[in-house]
Amino acid sequence: MNEDNSQNSEGPSRKSFFERLSQLFQGEPKDRQELVDVIRDSEVNDLIDHDTRDMLEGVMEIAEMRVRDIMIPRSQMVTIDRTHNLDALVAIMTDAQHSRYPVISEDKDHVEGILLAKDLLKYLGSNCAPFNIQEVIRPAVVVPESKRVDRLLKEFREERYHMAIVVDEFGGVSGLVTIEDILEEIVGDIEDEFDDEEQKDIRQLSKHTFSVKALTTIEDFNHTFGTKFSDEEVDTVGGLVMTAFGHLPARGEVVDIAGYNFKVTAADSRRVVALQVTVPDLEALSHVAEE
């Protein structure tokens, strides 16, 4: 009897969940929120793990996003001028460490094509053929800012290309987007072989200023600077700063928190990336430069 009662006591909640789960497969949910609820219930009931839930929600989110929401803005693009010689190209690629570069002409709004770093290999070393950039430029794919991200992902997969130039309604270049940008919306940040895992989260720039990664934990920040910022509501310095702003700040915006000046030095359409912090008193921070 007790066993039966136990099973019956679980009945309503389990029935409710399975009814919603079965609705997912037997017919379309009534709205987006209903689908989100089913996915989250699946995690609660251990049918999927947290990472899977995040990916499923990421897939849903890109269906509502436009290319302008995830593109790398024009001001942050690393481009190559068609007049550059081989030595100049190698220097740019060594510094930027990207695999693909837009090639531009004197008119910055005219992208002649895409140059792949690997296409320069045959020109390096002794007894190589004379370099002509026109021989290695590949056609550029151009997409409007308003294009849906999920449709662009489908085109990336079907056409087997990895980068597109983004243009505004007047045909001017406004940025670029890669397949990695889209995938990161689904699975989170993707680190490649060039990401510096050992780069310090906090680096001293001058006597009073420090470079701080937005993902630095508040605990580490407090330990370094002797501050007492709370980590009950946010875990990172980026979260602390965004809370103080009350919005997603752009590069160059500044806010003061408890006497500390935070300037956004890098940000994109989704997050704060890096900050410059000016501290009020360095007497107690002489150990930072040594760490």
Curated annotation (Swiss-Prot):
Q: Residue limits of the CBS domain?
A: 71-131, 136-193
Pfam family of the protein (one): NMB0537_N
What biological function has been recorded for the protein in this entry?
Plays a role in the transport of magnesium and cobalt ions.
Specify the protein name: Magnesium and cobalt efflux protein CorC
Asked whether the UniProt record includes Magnesium among its keywords, one would answer yes
Q: Which SUPFAM superfamilies match?
A: CBS-domain pair (SSF54631), FAD-binding/transporter-associated domain-like (SSF56176)
Keyword annotations of the record = CBS domain, Cobalt, Magnesium, Repeat, Transport
Q: Does the keyword GTP-binding apply?
A: no
A GO cellular component annotation in the UniProt record: plasma membrane
Q: State one molecular function term (GO).
A: flavin adenine dinucleotide binding
Which PANTHER family does its entry note? HEMOLYSIN-RELATED, MAGNESIUM AND COBALT EFFLUX PROTEIN CORC
Taxonomy, superkingdom:
Bacteria
Q: Which family does it belong to?
A: Belongs to the UPF0053 family.
InterPro entries reported in the protein's UniProt record:
CBS_dom, CBS_dom_sf, CorC_N, FAD-bd_PCMH-like_sf, FAD-bd_PCMH_sub2, Ion_transp-like_CBS, Transptr-assoc_dom
